[in-house]
Amino acid sequence: MSSKGKILLVDDDLDFLDMHTAVLKNHGYEVFTATSGREGLERVRTEMPDAIILDLMMEKHDTGFLFSQKIKTDPLFKEIPILMVTSVAEATGYRFSLQDDGYWMKTDDFLDKPVKPEVLLERLDTLLKKRRDAR
């Protein structure tokens, strides 16, 4: 079976990584994982994923916010869609920008945790279709 696309999952929650890696692989995606923003940036450079699923808050002040800023301001990677997943958006007042306004977090879509696999797959398929159509 050929791959539907290369997906990078970045989250410090190993249970989240294991569960969603299995879901994505079962639906035809090639999956790479990283447990920190630093490791995620290395994986982006080596794997050139078609999309990134990114946790907002990780340990040791290693936030998805910083990761997304680095990706979306790099000419080589800025077109890679980012699907942000978080359990803190409502509680902390984080705002997500689906536009490049310079103030909000740069992401292409977001989901609240816990993430339902069918919703994750639907959103991911939509992001990948938009990216293909834009080429």
Stretches found by the model and what they are:
Residues 42, 65-78:
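Short amphipathic alpha-helix used as the core "switch/output" element in two-component signaling
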